């Protein structure tokens, strides 16, 4: 999405293969979590319809998730974050 407000690092653990990375736009919050180098959770919240971020819409929004994955991977590459090695385009 072109309307990224700011990319956020939510948590980064010491081994760099476990943790969270995400992006936030004016409307959406997107987060991925990896454990030992494997993505085990992807979260997408539409804050305009779900301001408390309760309902994860990632599974029913594969096109948006794919766009966010690409944007996040680009950002991680630009910042030399090794977490990019664990992202595969969904």
Spans of model-derived segments:
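NUDIX/MutT-family hydrolases
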Residues: 46-47
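Active-site-proximal N-terminal segment of extracellular/periplasmic enzymes that hydrolyze or transfer
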Residues: 55-63
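Short, charged, surface-exposed hinge/linker loops at domain edges
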Residues: 84-90
């Amino acid at each position: 999405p072109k309307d990224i407000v700011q990319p956020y690092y939510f948590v980064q653990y010491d081994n760099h293969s476990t943790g969270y990375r995400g992006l936030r736009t004016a409307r959406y919050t997107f987060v991925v979590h990896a454990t030992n180098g494997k993505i085990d959770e992807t979260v997408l919240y539409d804050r305009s319809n779900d301001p408390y971020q309760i309902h994860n819409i990632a599974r029913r929004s594969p096109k948006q998730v794919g766009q966010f994955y690409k944007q996040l991977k680009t950002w991680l590459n630009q910042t030399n974050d090794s977490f990019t090695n664990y992202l595969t385009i969904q």
